[in-house]
Amino acid sequence: MSKEIKFGNDSRSKMLNGVNILADAVKITLGPKGRNVVIDKSYGAPQITKDGVTVAKEIELEDKFENMGAQMVKDVASQTNDAAGDGTTTATVLAQAIIADGLKAVAAGMNPMDLKRGIDQTVKAAVAELKKLSTPCSDSKAITQVGTISANSDHEIGEIIARAMQKVGNQGVITVEEGQGLETELDVVEGMQFDRGYLSPYFMTNHESGTVELENPYILLVDKKIGNIRELLPTLEAVAKASKPLLIIAEDVEGEALATLVVNNMRGIVKVCAVKAPGFGDRRKAMLQDIATLTGGTVISEEIGLDMEKVQLEDLGQAKRIVINKDETTIIDGIGDESVINARVSQIKQQIEASTSDYDKEKLQERSAKLAGGVAVIKVGASTEVEMKEKKDRVDDALHATRAAVEEGVVAGGGVALVRVAAILKGLTGENEDQNVGIRVALRAMEAPLRQIVENCGEEASVVANNVRQGEGNYGYNATTGEYGDMLEMGIIDPTKVARSALQFAASVAALMITTECMITDRPVAASAAAPDMGGMGGMGGMM
């Protein structure tokens, strides 16, 4: 297929058009008074959102050169979202400002490579200054404020996220699901829970709730299928003598073994329940070891030379309480040694850092959280499906933002931190005048988020930006109330990681676009010419 090629200013102007179309659609969502964007869907109701990356992902332009520009800025939003979970609109606004000013400088004859060096130098210095301005975020009040700001000033969402983090710890697993009611609720699963239920309903102890409830049980962990009851007899006899219930977690319990357990349970000889081990393959082995660590037991495995017929009570795990329904098992207050549990958690965290797969990381984080203290589920409530999707997006954003805040601290929000950094770096110089122009381009762009927030409020951006510039420290503009003051005291804060990621990714892609000299795309295929009318046969008119 033949290609279409554009060079120099022709290519850059087309690219800038695409950048502007995408950025203009995204930036109207910025700030507490940002507007909604309605996205048509091929099925179901339209989607209403104020999430920058959601808007960016929907944009595809007909002109292929313009589309290349749009897709590169879309990449800025996606990378920022992946790294920090929020700040996608800020990143898009920064990228647009750097690209627009940078391309003007290129058109005026500046060296694109020197401009790039100037921009890179500024961003490196800005990141260092942001870290100096950052303050730690550990208390519930600060976490609530971050969540509220990221959820577009929804205080309820901020509070629920702070409560969830309080319950399961800052590194705990918090998942977001669609709820059934109108209210957003927090459901905390304490202890270790895994998605395997009882193997037979005859194990049930509470028929009203359909659950098996075991108080102070022993736990037998076996890394194989159990089909022969003879293997279990020594364990059953020892547990019966101790007058305690028994939970068996194995790859499977079937045939004669399962039938005998059911009969013993129904006759009251020994209170017992059997469930399948969670996971598959190597992950199952790892999760059995997690349960063993939590309950102070040993996994009975032929691989390490342990035989079921020689199991002692000391090999069994113990917990204060276990609740099992047809789908899930929850182990509460295992008696495992805390130092051993902490060592296991540290080991899993090292695996998370070494892992390159997002899926593996997610599963490892779940395991770590289950060992460390539980899982929180935020069930989002709404009156319509459209509102549900929009609210769930905001809760996801707020959750990522609060995690980022706990990780690297917070800075003054509302675009103020970047304005302060720009003021600190005013005297920064490069090796030549073209690099100095690149530095000025990046410093001017740092005001763009503040200006856009103000514009979305319907106020005059230049006046507000000037007033903020004249202030010091955390002094800024509260776009919700229209007042000036200390942003931290007013609860308007941004995670440092979000501000840093937005600036770094925006500058990285923008600098690449400024140094673009040629663009290549497939030539559009012309529509085939319409076939001519067929001539009529004798005595007939032409066919229509």
UniProtKB/Swiss-Prot annotation:
It catalyses: ATP + H2O + a folded polypeptide = ADP + phosphate + an unfolded polypeptide. Forms a cylinder of 14 subunits composed of two heptameric rings stacked back-to-back. Interacts with the co-chaperonin GroES. ATP binds at T29, L30, G31, P32, K50, D86, G87, T88, T89, T90, G414, D494. CDD domains: GroEL. It is found in: Cytoplasm. It holds the Pfam family Cpn60_TCP1. The keyword ATP-binding applies. GO terms for molecular function: ATP binding; ATP-dependent protein folding chaperone; isomerase activity; unfolded protein binding. Its EC number is 5.6.1.7. GO terms for cellular component: cytoplasm. PROSITE patterns: CHAPERONINS_CPN60. Together with its co-chaperonin GroES, plays an essential role in assisting protein folding. The GroEL-GroES system forms a nano-cage that allows encapsulation of the non-native substrate proteins and provides a physical environment optimized to promote and accelerate protein folding. This is Chaperonin GroEL 2. One of its GO terms (biological process) is protein refolding. The keyword Amino-acid biosynthesis does not apply. Gene3D superfamilies: GroEL, GroEL-like equatorial domain, TCP-1-like chaperonin intermediate domain. Signal peptide: none annotated. Keywords: ATP-binding, Chaperone, Cytoplasm, Isomerase, Nucleotide-binding. Belongs to the chaperonin (HSP60) family.
